[in-house]
Structure formats: structure tokens, C-alpha cells
Swiss-Prot record:
Homodimer. One of its GO terms (cellular component) is cytosol. Keywords: Amino-acid biosynthesis, Histidine biosynthesis, Hydrolase, Methionine biosynthesis, Multifunctional enzyme, NADP, One-carbon metabolism, Oxidoreductase, Purine biosynthesis. Catalyzes the oxidation of 5,10-methylenetetrahydrofolate to 5,10-methenyltetrahydrofolate and then the hydrolysis of 5,10-methenyltetrahydrofolate to 10-formyltetrahydrofolate. CDD domains: NAD_bind_m-THF_DH_Cyclohyd. It comes from Lacticaseibacillus paracasei (strain ATCC 334 / BCRC 17002 / CCUG 31169 / CIP 107868 / KCTC 3260 / NRRL B-441). HAMAP family: THF_DHG_CYH. It catalyses: (6R)-5,10-methylene-5,6,7,8-tetrahydrofolate + NADP(+) = (6R)-5,10-methenyltetrahydrofolate + NADPH; (6R)-5,10-methenyltetrahydrofolate + H2O = (6R)-10-formyltetrahydrofolate + H(+). This is Bifunctional protein FolD. The keyword DNA damage does not apply.
Length: 283
């Protein structure tokens, strides 16, 4: 039976360690500061932002919320980003996505100072990642790598298959895996023989948003399975992209949903906010 990779427990330890680091920074008059820009009133975004703020307060990160109305123009949003870019007391900027219709998300991402881009979405951050240079990266991939590390799962030399090619998970995770000496394949909706490909993976990452997309017939015995998906079934039950009950007897390790990758994402956001604050403190 597979080991369950407990993201709640690992994230709790990460946050506790960060709290100590932040207390040490406070002795040098440095308070890690995260600016969150929320445009409109997307319910899912509201929940996620509240969770971020709660975690920030728990560990001593200063979290500033900038709410902008649904009718915000592109020019007004870019002006707010520019203002935050030039504020010397702000270490990290996060514009909560998705933005309301009519706003150009990529233009907003491009406008964020790469040295404050805590999501790692800017072209400069992406370039640094693929050049294997120090940079912040998207929080979910960062959290996945931290979770694997916490369980001493070494990716070097492993065959990794990532199902999903989003800029939020699949692509940046591929970069991190390559930088840690894994052999990586990204699969997607146009990939032929996808389940056969998945079955060749030593480490299988699934991020497609389709409940129980992967079952026992697509997993190699002994594989590590990372389930990034989270959906709700007709009965309201939270479901992952992987059928855990079917796959757990085959895999060597698996992330539960909920309680696997999800908690690691916010912990990773906090960790990278602290990293950016340290950079500011060191000049």
C-alpha cells in the first residue's frame, strides 16, 4: 500500500520554520511584505486570498490586500502594479488570477517587477527557471518539489511524466524536475497513448482537473503519484484527478486529495515571500 504524502503535516513544519526565520528578520527591522491585488469578486479567488492572508498573519508576513472593482480598466490595473513595483517596502506582488473578462492577464504579469514576482509567472522568472538560475517559481510546483524532498524522494535519474501543460503547474514543474536531473515528458490532451505513457513513469504528476482521470491501469507498480487536481463530484465530495482507492495498492507513494498538494501551495508562497524579503535585506 502506498505511503500517503501528507502535505498538511509538511506544510505545517515549513510554516513553523518560516515563523522562526521571520522572527530573526524582525531583529534586523525586516518584515516580509506581500501585496495581493484582487480584481472583482470571484468566489474561489476570495477563498484562496483569505487563506493566504490567514497563513501570512500566523507566521508574521505582512499581507496587504488591494481590492479593485470588477470594472477596473487595464490602465488602472497596470498603474496599481507600477505603484507596487516602486514601493520599497513591498517584497512580493501577487495579482490573483483569473482576472475579469476584458483584462489582459499576460500584460499584467509582464508588468510585475521580476524581483517581486512571487508567482514566478513573468517571462524573466520563467527564463531564469529554464536557465537553471536562482529564481522564484510558481507555488504549486515549488510545493510539489518540497513535498517530495520531505519524504526523501529523489527525482534524479527518474522518468517523470507530467499530465498537464499549464503555466501554473505543468511547465514550471517540468523545469524544476529537469533542473534536478529528472528525465521529463509533458503530456496533454493531444498526446497519443497517454495511459501507456503514464504507465512508464517512475513519478507521475496529474494536473488536468478531471475527476479520477487516472486509474490503476495507467500506473506502474511502485510509481510515485502526485495528484494536483481538485474537483467536486455530483454529491459534493472533493475528488482528485487520480482514483486513490484504485491506485494506492499499486503505487509506492501518493498524495491524497484533499491534504496533499493543496496545503503545500500556500506554504510555498510564504516561503518565497520570505526569500524575496531576504534579498531586499541583503541589498
Amino acid at each position: 500500500m502506498a505511503t500517503r504524502l501528507d502535505g498538511r503535516a509538511v506544510s505545517k513544519k515549513i510554516l513553523a520554520d518560516l515563523k522562526q526565520t521571520i522572527a530573526q528578520l524582525a531583529q534586523h527591522d525586516v518584515t516580509p511584505t506581500l501585496a495581493v491585488v484582487l480584481v472583482g469578486s470571484n468566489p474561489a479567488s476570495e477563498v484562496y486570498v483569505r487563506n493566504k492572508q490567514r497563513r501570512a498573519e500566523d507566521i508574521g508576513v505582512r499581507s496587504l490586500m488591494f481590492r479593485m472593482p470588477e470594472a477596473t480598466t487595464q490602465a488602472d490595473l497596470l498603474a496599481k502594479v507600477a505603484e507596487l513595483n516602486h514601493d520599497p517596502d513591498i517584497d512580493a506582488i501577487l495579482v490573483q488570477l483569473p482576472l475579469p473578462a476584458g483584462l489582459d492577464e499576460q500584460a499584467v504579469i509582464d508588468a510585475i517587477d521580476p524581483d517581486k514576482d512571487v508567482d514566478g509567472f513573468s517571462p524573466v522568472s520563467v527564463g531564469r527557471l529554464w536557465a537553471n538560475e536562482p529564481t522564484v517559481v510558481a507555488s504549486t510546483p515549488y510545493g510539489i518539489m518540497a513535498l517530495l524532498d520531505a519524504y526523501d524522494i529523489d527525482v534524479a535519474g527518474k522518468r517523470v511524466v507530467i499530465i498537464g501543460r499549464s503555466n501554473i503547474v505543468g511547465r514550471p514543474l517540468a523545469g524544476l524536475m529537469v533542473n534536478h536531473d529528472a528525465t521529463v515528458t509533458i503530456a496533454h490532451s493531444k498526446t497519443r497513448d497517454l495511459k501507456q505513457l503514464a504507465k512508464e513513469a517512475d513519478i507521475l504528476v496529474v494536473a488536468v482537473g478531471v475527476p479520477h482521470f487516472i486509474g490503476a491501469d495507467a500506473v506502474k507498480p511502485g510509481a510515485v503519484v502526485i495528484d494536483v487536481g481538485i474537483s467536486r463530484g455530483a454529491d459534493g465530495k472533493v475528488l482528485g484527478d487520480v482514483d486513490e482507492a484504485a491506485v494506492a495498492p499499486i503505487a509506492s507513494a501518493i498524495t491524497p486529495v484533499p491534504g496533499g498538494v493543496g496545503p503545500m501551495t500556500i506554504a510555498s508562497l510564504m516561503a518565497q515571500t520570505v526569500t524575496l524579503a531576504k534579498r531586499r535585506a541583503n541589498g
